[in-house]
Amino acid sequence: MTGILRTAACMLLLAGLAYGHHSFTAEFDEHKPVKMTGKVTEMKWSNPHGWIYIDVTGPDGKTVNWALETGGANALYRRGWRKEDLPAGTVLVVEGWQARNGTPTANVSSITFTNGKRLFAGSSNSDAPQQ
């Protein structure tokens, strides 16, 4: 019986840690929306989150590489994304929310290509703001 209780306690603890890791509000600030234009330097097609890296040139002329968290590969595929959609050099307009820690990191809600095509890129977290 104590083995079952220990197992249950461990599962509850780990579930809480997993939820905290994937919580939008723990990592991103819904009061800090960002919109930026940049060129893709890399796309990591992975689960549980994909990552797009883009170079953004600021008003001061300095280029900063932003790390942009998306939904996972399976979710992106269901939304119409394909790996070949984002080769290096592709220009994108990205909308999302900045990381709470102030780094050039954001959770992406959508991207728009220069031809006007728009794709939803957000994670499926229920606590992420809806646009």
Model-derived features: positions:
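Bacterial N-terminal signal peptides that target proteins for export
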Residues: 1-9
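Conserved hydrophobic positions within beta-strands
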Residues: 36-40
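Short aromatic-glycine-enriched beta-strand elements
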Residues: 46-56
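OB-fold/S1-family single-stranded nucleic acid-binding modules
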Residues: 99-123
